[in-house]
Amino acid sequence: MGACVVMTDINISSGLDSNATGITAFSMPGWQLALWTAAYLALVLVAVMGNATVIWIILAHQRMRTVTNYFIVNLALADLCMAAFNAAFNFVYASHNIWYFGRAFCYFQNLFPITAMFVSIYSMTAIAADRYMAIVHPFQPRLSAPGTRAVIAGIWLVALALAFPQCFYSTITTDEGATKCVVAWPEDSGGKMLLLYHLIVIALIYFLPLVVMFVAYSVIGLTLWRRSVPGHQAHGANLRHLQAKKKFVKTMVLVVVTFAICWLPYHLYFILGTFQEDIYCHKFIQQVYLALFWLAMSSTMYNPIIYCCLNHRFRSGFRLAFRCCPWVTPTEEDKMELTYTPSLSTRVNRCHTKEIFFMSGDVAPSEAVNGQAESPQAGVSTEP
């Protein structure tokens, strides 16, 4: 790293150590700092409120407690924590170049961002895998409730293990009287160990899961399209069921694409800096970093907006959650969307209809757990 750089050493989920963030010692005008503060404050508020509402909608309503939705809760929790504990604190550090938050929080900030990003993207991957099994291999056993909890716990444990090396080498230093939170990696020949760690982390928290999801959703899309061609037409409730599956897949594809777009420039920034360190000596680099960091962190606030726009149950949930606002008026239909449970006879008839249409090759009974047709409470809601 060039001598002109004041290193801010919080890794923001990029897999590259934070002492490569490249924030220069140049201070910004007060008006500029005020604009950036407003932008980051808006991001944090929208992300925290939106993801907290998503978690409430799912956990507070039995009809919404499904396998897929539990992964959405995991995703929302990671995004909420990322916005609350990483975006705000790292913005303060990046804009002031002084670490105000103590040694313990320095360790936490070099552990949690990679952990949260890993949890976010692998929760999306788990959703893609669940949809793949439900739609492409409907006769295969589905995740049970204990299995879902085990997958979520496994995601968090692997994420913590992946982030641990950076946390382990974190330390507090003083540079010209200013406290810094740095990652003091051990010296080796040419920094090969550090570069290898960077590449492994970027591959695991970005490129690999995106490739897996691209393949999964491509196969899902082809499968659903094949069921829509002439000769394989579904009708009535089964047509609506098929359309609901398509809409859910489109929603999750949009979530994944948004995540990929938001994080790609940030990863490229660090990759470029690894091979061309003098870019951090330019005066404009602080503004570039703050813009790329804001774009990456903004990925935490888009998912609730996407759910609200594309899923009518989440839309009803948001109306109920914000009913205290004068411009929001929830209806009885909104309450029914989240609380209504079909009668036993309705569920039996629905399962019977799915079985008939599946045997004819039209609609797969995707709401199956361990090979059995499930009730709305136990299954995966694919309705829009």
UniProtKB/Swiss-Prot annotation:
S-S bridge residues: 106-181
Domain of life: Eukaryota
Transmembrane segments: 33-56, 70-90, 108-129, 150-170, 197-218, 252-272, 291-310
UniProt GO BP: positive regulation of flagellated sperm motility; regulation of uterine smooth muscle contraction
Compartments in which it is found: Cell membrane
Entries under CDD domains matching the protein: 7tmA_SKR_NK2R
An example Gene Ontology molecular-function term: substance K receptor activity
Name of a matching Pfam family: 7tm_1
Topological type in the membrane: Multi-pass membrane protein
Gene Ontology annotations for the cellular component aspect, listed alphabetically: plasma membrane; sperm head; sperm midpiece
Membrane in keyword set: yes
Described function: This is a receptor for the tachykinin neuropeptide substance K (neurokinin A). It is associated with G proteins that activate a phosphatidylinositol-calcium second messenger system. The rank order of affinity of this receptor to tachykinins is: substance K > neuromedin-K > substance P.
Protein name: Substance-K receptor
Organism phylogeny: Eukaryota, Metazoa, Chordata, Craniata, Vertebrata
